Amino acid sequence: MIKITLKDGKVMEIEEGIKISDIAMKISPALYKKALAAKIDGETVDLMTELHKDSSLEILTFEDEMGKWALRHTGAHILAQAVKRLYPEVKLAIGPAIDTGFYYDFEADFTFTPEMLEKIEAEIKKIIKENHKLERFELPREEAINLMKEKNEDYKVELIEDLPEGEVISFYKQGDFTDLCAGPHVPSTGKVKSVKLLSLAGAYWRGDEKNKMLQRIYGTAFTKKSELDEYLNMIEEAKKRDHRKLGKELDLFSIHEEGPGFPFFHPKGMIVRNILESFWREKHTKAGYQEIRTPLILNEALWHQSGHWDHYKENMYFTNIDDGDYAIKPMNCPGGILVYKSSMHSYRDLPLRLSELGIVHRHELSGALHGLMRVRCFTQDDAHLYMTKEQIKEEVIGIIKLIDEFYKLFGFEYFVELSTRPEDSMGSDEDWEIATNGLREALDSIGKEYRVNEGDGAFYGPKIDFHLKDCIGRTWQCGTIQLDFQMPERFDLSYIGADGEKHRPVMVHRTIYGSVERFIGILIEQYAGAFPTWLAPVQVKLMNITDSQYDYLKKVEETLKENNIRVEIDTRNEKIGYKIREAQLQKVPYMLILGDKEVEAGKVAVRSRKDGDLGAISLEEFIEKIKNEIKNKTN
């Protein structure tokens, strides 16, 4: 008999060699029906996996991220099987699960069309109905290569040949279809209840522009049709809110072929950006942070010393200055460390909180670029805090509260994830344990719920990630708190303790917006371009009905500007209804309409983007109203 510890702490004694699916049935028939995959000692596996030793076990359903992943991974295999049935000459490349579904890349001597997708989708439904079992098997390298050569799958052969010697080479078979895959998968194709193919795109093999362009089919999968329908509605809403579309319509930013991945901010976009950065500075000053600025370009040796060279070299840009090798910074932390090292520190100086709105550059493949969400140049709202081990808990609590204040202001719900030590980490077991426990204790002490994401920490320390949930249910990872014992060691950082001796400080890396550019993109989509008044590039659109109100309009404009209200005027010889519609399309919070009646009464007719016609009021009354709205940062 072996002992199995369940997620709730309950221990089961069961016979050795039992399959996880059978354990799920023993726990509950309802759980067995919903089960998609499992975690054994933190590793995600198939339900058909047999257990031969004492283990911790978590049964995964569609409510769990890795349960979704397993189902959608199987969805990708079903897509590939359907394509091969209909178009046998097509060659298979790769087909992973992704956050919102799955995709599969194909090489074909024809172009897939929307009509073909309908045909493929019909075949997918047949495969689901056939309910084929997914059977995993392993082969030695030569046999695996020969199997894929027999099937004329050149890309699979290349993948196998690139695997390290001794690597397990596994396949999954479902009916008449076999694919190279590490898994895990759901037990049968019938578990994938609802599938929808979403779009077509081009994708270079292995993301390299020098390689062949393949055809990518995107899809998604759910366990219920109602969930799929809800997701498809969300996609339609997301299209309306697409920040790339709204960014152009509202004249906020642009991206040009002369600089792919390098956004250009227009005057209105700069207003939004400057407000966000000013607010950030104000809150950080109150929280005891001191702002610094570090150079864009630093000697290559610095990145070797920090360890970033080993982990980020492929995503860095380089240059040569005076025969020396330099790198454009992909992160702000090494520069911030040099600021710390520039003077001696006492324990009385700690905690020391240094903040920086630092521009960083990271190379992204052209196919991964996406508006402001995925760029090659962005501003990271970093802060690096230096402290004693005893100060970790209180400092982390302070950061969590600051992050919470920011996200609530913008109307975001969020969830928290604690990520633990990855395989390619630096540092001792003891340091990692102290660091992880420090983050865990801070979260526990303020009653903040969190998930544990095993093995997803930074290479230098564990981290807390903050995932925003927007108004249509999508999640965005923005804020992060990363505890770091390694950088202080690598850079020989120290402070003088109360005993007069040198001690090593603990370092915390943290962001709130994450990337300022990306956060702006998220806000554009969160508000569908209709920024709250305090954040709107234009707060008031002032418009006259005829030329006879022009002089009064200019006086009103001047008064609004004197009160620091952002105003634009529309004096074109157009009908007032046309002007109002255009201002509404520009998402302006307030329109002030001036006709002869308003001139005579010394008033303004107010129209709100949100509430419609508010009637005629005095200019003073309107100014008081809008200034209160701006001051209170009303959403």
From Swiss-Prot:
Q: Which CDD domains match?
A: TGS_ThrRS, ThrRS_anticodon, ThrRS_core
The name under which this protein is listed is Threonine--tRNA ligase
| Family as reported in the entry's similarity comment | Belongs to the class-II aminoacyl-tRNA synthetase family.
Its gene name is thrS
A Pfam family name for this chain?
Answer: TGS
**GO molecular function term, any single one:** ATP binding
Q: GO terms for biological process?
A: threonyl-tRNA aminoacylation
Q: What's the cofactor?
A: Zn(2+)
Q: Give the keywords, sorted.
A: Aminoacyl-tRNA synthetase, ATP-binding, Cytoplasm, Ligase, Metal-binding, Nucleotide-binding, Protein biosynthesis, RNA-binding, tRNA-binding, Zinc
List each copy of the TGS domain by range: 1-61
Q: Where is this region: Catalytic?
A: 242-532
Q: Which organism is it from?
A: Clostridium botulinum (strain Langeland / NCTC 10281 / Type F)
How does this chain assemble?
Homodimer.
**Matching PANTHER family:** THREONINE--TRNA LIGASE, CHLOROPLASTIC_MITOCHONDRIAL 2, THREONINE-TRNA LIGASE
Co-factor remark: Binds 1 zinc ion per subunit.
User: Which Enzyme Commission number(s) are listed?
Assistant: 6.1.1.3
Q: Where in the cell is it found?
A: Cytoplasm
Q: What class of enzyme is it?
A: ligase
**Which is one Gene Ontology cellular component term of this protein?**
cytoplasm
Catalytic activity, reaction form: tRNA(Thr) + L-threonine + ATP = L-threonyl-tRNA(Thr) + AMP + diphosphate + H(+)
* Residue positions binding Zn(2+): 333, 384, 509
Q: What does this protein do?
A: Catalyzes the attachment of threonine to tRNA(Thr) in a two-step reaction: L-threonine is first activated by ATP to form Thr-AMP and then transferred to the acceptor end of tRNA(Thr). Also edits incorrectly charged L-seryl-tRNA(Thr).
Alphabetical list of InterPro entries matching this protein? aa-tRNA-synt_IIb, aa-tRNA-synth_II, aa-tRNA-synth_II/BPL/LPL, Anticodon-bd, Anticodon-bd_dom_sf, Beta-grasp_dom_sf, TGS, TGS-like
